A protein has these predicted regions:
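Core AdoMet radical
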Residues: 59-74, 81-133
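Non-transmembrane, interaction-prone segments in cytosolic or luminal domains
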Residues: 5, 53, 80, 131-132
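Short charge-dense sequence patches
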Residues: 5-6, 21-33, 55-65, 118, ...
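Generic detector of short, locally flexible boundary/turn motifs and exposed helical patches
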Residues: 2-7, 17-18, 54-56, 85-90, ...
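Flexible, acidic/Gly-rich N-terminal and inter-domain linker regions that tether
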Residues: 1-51
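Active-site cofactor/substrate anionic-group-binding motifs, chiefly glycine-
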Residues: 30-84
């Protein structure tokens, strides 16, 4: 499905929206059933290079105690999530786009997939990144 069709579907109203929601529920129940899946949130760093005024971890906020979890701490948390049947984890940090940071996250993703036999889903929330990243 292309982007234009998705946008059109999301903009539906009235009976068409009702039918869309009904169909989406049918697909969801067929694919994953009527279940709840746990997702672990791993806030591994609050270091950020941006200065967004709305954000509590913005670069200029000197009242924040900064932290950056070790790779072992992150991998241990992911292993815990996998051992306890979490469907996925979110790796979240402030926005950093340096090459060492990108390399670190790339290595973590590979190790998480390895330790979970490629079973643990991963969502990244590390701010805006370049298309190539």
């Amino acid at each position: 499905m292309d982007k234009q069709k998705i946008v059109r579907l999301l903009q539906t109203e009235g009976e068409e929206r009702t039918q869309l929601l009904k169909k989406s529920r049918e697909v969801k129940e067929k694919v994953v059933g009527n279940k709840v899946y746990f997702r672990g949130l791993i806030e591994f760093s609050n270091i950020c290079s941006k200065d967004c005024l709305y954000c509590g971890i913005r670069k200029s906020n000197t009242n924040v105690v900064r932290y950056d979890s070790t790779d072992k701490e992150i991998l241990d948390a992911c292993h815990f999530a996998w051992e306890n049947s979490f469907a996925s984890v979110v790796l979240q940090s402030g926005e950093v786009s340096s090459k060492p940071f990108i390399h670190r996250v790339d290595n973590l993703l590979k190790k998480i997939k390895q330790l979970s036999n490629n079973e643990l889903g991963i969502t990244l929330s590390c701010g805006e990144q370049s298309r190539e990243t």
